[in-house]
């Protein structure tokens, strides 16, 4: 193919052209007519020549009436007729006038004619049924001679090109179109017709060429274009953007193609309306119309938009300008509304004015200027010496509405200005007037009284004290408390920040005299210190913090006698406690009390309002001092504490135990802290971001990614972890080789930009994990909070989750001995016993989702309980685990949850025992899903009527019997984790007992129901339910159980008064009584579960033959009822 006057296309691209013609929008063609015989009204008098005879009347000009004419004026049309079959070998020619070709490069000759068949004549001398058409091109518009002469034509006949030989195609008139390429320098043409003994009526001759009409596509305008000289030519069309439009992509040509058929298409390029103009559809395709006043449009394909608030525009505007006094920030888009700077702060006051300091506070401005952000700046101006003034937390970009000012001079006047700012404040010309001003005068040194006074010991115990103090300003609630050994050679101390007027120190050394002092945070004035020693009370303060070592030795000598006396007292108390514990051994524990509601527990939680943060000097302290000063619990705690509070446990009970006591610490609910960050400091170890790194992402969670990483062995966190691992056994499975400088750890990250709530929940999980230290509970190493992203660093478990490990092992055909499985279950039970002894709260907000997926395995196949997250999103449909069953109190994993926890929201250690039974079934089935593909509602209804999971294939009956023990409906009949540990320990010592069923199993119940083809249940005699199942309910109770109590009246009105009557009613009868089809199916499923003992909706064992139907035997689904 040839692209005329532009570029040459490969001939093999014809298929591509056809595809373009089919897919791209095609514009209609246009014909430019050069000659039309039907439109000629006068005589033609065309030249004619008979080469082989001396005749000049072979072609006769006649008139005929065209019935298809569009108007009466052209109904009678000129035509040429010839019929010379009686001539011998004729060659008769007819020549048209000269026809100007204009800009045509290819012309089309459309002929309308009719002929007669030769067999219509008896004895023709020379008869033909075809005629020929010729064309000759001329380089001039007016040739010298127009008359055709016979002699000259005979010599010139070779210059006439034969363009077609035509014959009739039907019995009526035939239309044929011939195409001919025109040379670029041709001005005129003549058409000739040769007949050689044919009866022919030449009714019409139409000569034209094709033009691709002008068109607009995607705001690109293309002018009319003549088609190319060849039938396969495509002529390039250069487009241009319509007015008020420009190219969408600069540099891309606007190109179209004019096909030989006269159809134009756009192939590349696109235009968009300019800024301030919007695209409007019209009859030509589209146009760009200017945006009206108070609207705007940037460049692109969007429509005109109304101006944002506080802005206006003129016609054809690309953006809106802000009204006077309104602005946009430099980083804001033109679509954002215009805003103002905030007004001045209000109610600026100075509090706690002393000789050298004061605290300024103010309220938010009355107008924020329509913007969400605001910050404050404070300036010392005018009066007073401002060079020594120090502002905390600073004087620029303050997000709080208060500032502590220190460094003032006594008895001096100062002026302070407070400005409110936002992102547009810098553009406001009169900003200096938008401020609040206050004048103050500091006190003299004589009248300046320290704000903290009357420091005293409020309560004391054998190893701790509570100190309290008074303040002159009741609004102050942020204090800094310092404690230090009063008699040491080195100046070592520790500080903590509290928000109450008391705090507690526990684990104090009876041999040490401690000195305490308090001040308001950010205030340089300390209270008068007090010194205190356990067993001796308040001591007179030494004249100096540094005394001779001999003085220290004299005091320690006298303290030895006190220590010996204390040891004797402790031994006596311990003996008394043992006697008391034996007497109360069978008493019910606090955590099992049913009457202690959640709201009552919350109201009896002891005070946790203080926080302990190590001072930056803490590196110089003795190693035991941090352990001694950990408690924040007030000594005079409530007499009836909530479960898990420190005082509910045997002493010592100041938030923990002595490091060497060997007893479990009690679990502390992080949500009882007023500031969750305080709990994070107390129970976790902060890791430097430089000591931890991420190597790869191995999973994802709600808050962020779960990654594999490393922890530097030289870091304090690694050293602390190594000590704990030495104490309780090596933890995770990827601890790193000895030659490597890092430990392999698991890292859970928080997504950048997470909300404050998400971050608090994320770190609360770390606070929970940080309280646990057990070989079968996942171990927290520390947290990273000083850099993004925030991380939780825990030990790495190389074998992943327990359920996935079992499934993979089973798929690979590897065998795990039942002895090893028993050891795994022993480890899970051990970890659960530890959590129960810790007092880990059994409430839905802290629900322990005990399932095989939340148990991890290390390299030694040691099981560790994990996943202590507070907030779990509902899993997607694509997950392997069905979404949790949601109630008003939270989300419950129904398949693992005890019945009383689902129905009554009662979570106790017995609830965890039920879940542990399901875990046993998961492990014995090698990761199979509990209750298979049943819905949550079906699981609930089946469990409530006594259904229990059947034993997995090849499962030892000893293990399955333990699971059944855990699934007792009455929670008080279930075993404790202590009992479970004893049983598993026995199995480990005597593996042969695993295969032995130590007790009588519940009776296996087979379905006795039969369904006919119409869905009714045929029950001859209602079978006796299992001994432990509920009795047959009344009709009303049964309908309530399946959620159809609203149809009770319909059934009773149709003489159905019992469940037996309902069981003998067919599906069609139920429909006739007014029940919907879905309700009938629910009744049938409920009857299957009630009568047969098989799960509702499952197939019965036998379908009886009724009403002439055939007997079928679907697969049997069996279960156990208890």
UniProtKB/Swiss-Prot annotation:
It is a single-pass type I membrane protein. Residues 1091-1122 are annotated as: Disordered. Keywords: ATP-binding, Cell membrane, Developmental protein, Glycoprotein, Kinase, Membrane, Neurogenesis, Nucleotide-binding, Phosphoprotein, Receptor, Repeat, Signal, Transferase, Transmembrane, Transmembrane helix, Tyrosine-protein kinase. Its EC number is 2.7.10.1. The keyword RNA-binding does not apply. Dephosphorylated by daf-18. Disruption phenotype: RNAi-mediated knockdown results in impaired inhibition of oocyte maturation and ovulation in the presence of reduced numbers of self-derived sperm. As a result, hermaphrodites lay increased numbers of unfertilized oocytes. Reduced sheath cell contraction rate in somatic cells. The keyword Transmembrane applies. Its main location: membrane. This is Ephrin receptor 1. It comes from Caenorhabditis elegans. The gene is vab-1.
């Amino acid at each position: 193919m040839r692209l005329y006057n532009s570029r040459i296309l490969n001939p093999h691209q014809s298929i591509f052209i056809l595809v373009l013609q089919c897919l791209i929008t095609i514009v209609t063609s246009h014909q430019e007519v050069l000659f039309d015989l039907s439109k000629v009204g006068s005589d033609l008098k065309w030249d004619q020549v008979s080469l082989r005879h001396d005749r000049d009347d072979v072609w006769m000009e006649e008139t005929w009436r065209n019935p298809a004419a569009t108007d009466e004026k052209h109904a009678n049309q000129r035509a040429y007729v010839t019929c010379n079959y009686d001539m011998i070998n004729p060659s008769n020619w007819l020549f048209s006038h000269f026809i100007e070709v204009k800009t045509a490069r290819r012309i089309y000759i459309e002929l309308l004619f009719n002929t007669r068949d030769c067999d219509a004549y008896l004895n023709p001398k020379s008869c033909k049924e075809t005629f020929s058409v010729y064309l000759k091109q001329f380089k001039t518009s007016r040739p010298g001679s127009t008359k055709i002469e016979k002699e000259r034509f005979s010599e010139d006949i070779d210059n006439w090109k034969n363009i077609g030989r035509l014959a009739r195609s039907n019995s009526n008139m035939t239309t044929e179109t011939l195409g001919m390429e025109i040379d670029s320098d041709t001005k005129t043409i003549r058409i000739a017709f040769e007949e050689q003994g044919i009866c022919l009526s030449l009714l019409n001759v139409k000569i034209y060429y094709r033009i691709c009409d002008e068109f607009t596509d995607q705001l690109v305008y293309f002018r009319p274009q003549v088609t190319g000289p060849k039938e396969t030519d495509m002529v390039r069309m250069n487009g241009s953007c319509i007015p008020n439009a420009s190219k969408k992509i600069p540099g891309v040509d606007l190109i179209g193609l004019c096909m030989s058929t006269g159809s134009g298409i756009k192939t590349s390029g696109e235009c968009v309306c300019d800024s301030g103009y919007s695209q409007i559809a019209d009859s030509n395709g589209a146009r760009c119309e200017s945006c009206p006043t108070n609207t705007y449009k940037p460049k692109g394909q969007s429509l005109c938009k109304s101006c944002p608030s506080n802005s206006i525009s003129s016609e054809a505007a690309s953006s809106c300008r802000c009204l006077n006094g309104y602005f946009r920030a430099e980083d804001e888009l033109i679509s954002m509304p215009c805003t103002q700077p905030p007004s001045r702060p209000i109610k600026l006051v100075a509090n706690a004015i002393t000789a050298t300091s004061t605290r300024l506070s103010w309220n938010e401005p009355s107008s924020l200027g329509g913007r969400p952000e605001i910050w404050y700046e404070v300036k010392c101006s005018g009066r007073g010496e401002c060079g020594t003034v120090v502002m905390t937390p600073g004087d620029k970009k303050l997000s709080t509405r208060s500032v502590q000012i220190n460094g003032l001079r006594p008895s001096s006047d100062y002026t302070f200005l407070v400005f409110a700012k936002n992102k547009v404040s810098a553009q406001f010309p009169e900003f200096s007037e938008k401020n609040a001003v206050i004048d103050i005068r500091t006190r003299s040194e004589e009248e300046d009284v320290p704000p903290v006074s009357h420091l005293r010991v409020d309560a004391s115990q054998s190893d701790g004290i509570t100190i309290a103090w008074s303040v002159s300003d009741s609004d102050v609630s942020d204090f800094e408390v310092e404690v230090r050994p009063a008699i040491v050679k080195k100046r070592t101390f520790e500080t903590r920040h509290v928000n109450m007027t008391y705090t507690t120190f526990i684990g104090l050394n009876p041999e040490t005299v401690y000195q305490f002092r308090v001040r308001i945070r950010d205030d340089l004035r300390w209270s008068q210190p007090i010194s205190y020693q356990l067993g001796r009370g308040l001591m007179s303060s030494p004249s100096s913090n540094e005394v001779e070592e001999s003085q220290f030795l004299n005091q320690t000598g006298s303290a030895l006698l006190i220590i010996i006396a204390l040891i004797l007292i402790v031994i006596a108390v311990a003996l008394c406690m043992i006697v008391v514990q034996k007497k109360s051994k069978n008493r019910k524990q606090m955590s099992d009390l049913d009457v202690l509601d959640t709201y009552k527990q919350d109201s009896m939680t002891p005070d946790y309002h203080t926080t302990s943060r190590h001072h930056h000097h803490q590196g110089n302290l003795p190693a035991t001092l941090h352990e001694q000063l950990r408690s924040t619990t007030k000594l005079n705690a409530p007499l009836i504490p909530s479960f898990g509070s420190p005082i509910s446990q045997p002493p010592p009970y100041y938030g923990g135990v002595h490091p060497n006591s060997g007893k479990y610490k009690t679990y502390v609910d992080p949500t009882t802290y007023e500031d969750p960050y305080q709990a994070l400091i107390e129970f976790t170890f902060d890791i430097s971001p430089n000591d931890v790194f991420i190597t790869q992402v191995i999973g994802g969670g709600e808050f962020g990614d779960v990654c594999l990483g490393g922890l530097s062995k030289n870091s304090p966190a690694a050293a602390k972890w190594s000590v704990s691992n030495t104490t309780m056994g090596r933890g995770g499975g990827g601890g790193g080789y000895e030659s490597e400088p890092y430990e392999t750890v698991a890292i859970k990250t928080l997504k950048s930009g997470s909300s404050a709530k998400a971050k608090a929940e994320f770190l609360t999980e770390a606070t929970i994990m940080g309280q646990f230290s057990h070989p079968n509970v996942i171990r927290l190493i520390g947290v990273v909070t000083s850099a993004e992203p925030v991380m939780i660093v825990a030990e790495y478990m190389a074998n992943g989750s327990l359920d996935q490990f079992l499934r993979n092992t089973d798929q690979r055909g590897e065998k795990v001995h039942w002895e090893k499985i028993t050891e795994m279950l022993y480890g899970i039970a051990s970890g659960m016993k530890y959590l129960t002894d810790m007092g880990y709260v059994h409430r839905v907000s802290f629900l322990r989702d005990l399932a095989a997926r939340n148990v991890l395995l290390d390299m030694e196949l040691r099981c560790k309980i994990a996943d202590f997250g507070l907030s779990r999103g509902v899993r997607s449909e694509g997950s392997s685990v069905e979404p949790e069953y949601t109630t008003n109190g939270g989300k419950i994993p129904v398949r693992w949850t005890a019945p009383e926890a689902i129905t009554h929201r009662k979570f106790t250690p017995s609830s965890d025992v039920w879940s542990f039974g399901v875990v046993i079934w998961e492990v014995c089935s090698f990761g199979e899903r509990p209750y298979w593909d049943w819905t949550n509602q079906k699981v609930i209804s089946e469990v409530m009527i006594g259904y229990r999971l059947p034993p997995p294939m090849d499962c030892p009956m000893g293990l399955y019997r333990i699971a059944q023990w855990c699934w007792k409906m009455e929670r008080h009949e279930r075993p404790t984790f202590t009992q479970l540990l004893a049983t598993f320990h026995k199995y480990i010592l005597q593996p042969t007992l695993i295969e032995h069923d130590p007790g009588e199993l519940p009776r296996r119940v087979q379905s006795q129901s039969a369904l006919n083809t119409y869905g009714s249940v045929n029950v001859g005699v209602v079978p006796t339910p299992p001994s432990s199942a509920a009795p047959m309910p009344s009709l009303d109770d049964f309908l309530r159980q399946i959620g159809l109590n609203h149809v009770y009246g319909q059934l009773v009105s149709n003489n159905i008064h019992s469940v037996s009557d309902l069981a003998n009613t067919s599906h069609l009868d139920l429909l006739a009584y007014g029940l919907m089809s879905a309700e009938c199916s629910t009744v049938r499923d409920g009857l299957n579960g009630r009568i047969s003992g098989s799960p509702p909706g499952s197939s019965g064992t036998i379908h009886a033959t009724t009403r002439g139907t055939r007997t079928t035997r679907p697969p049997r689904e069996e279960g156990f009822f208890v």
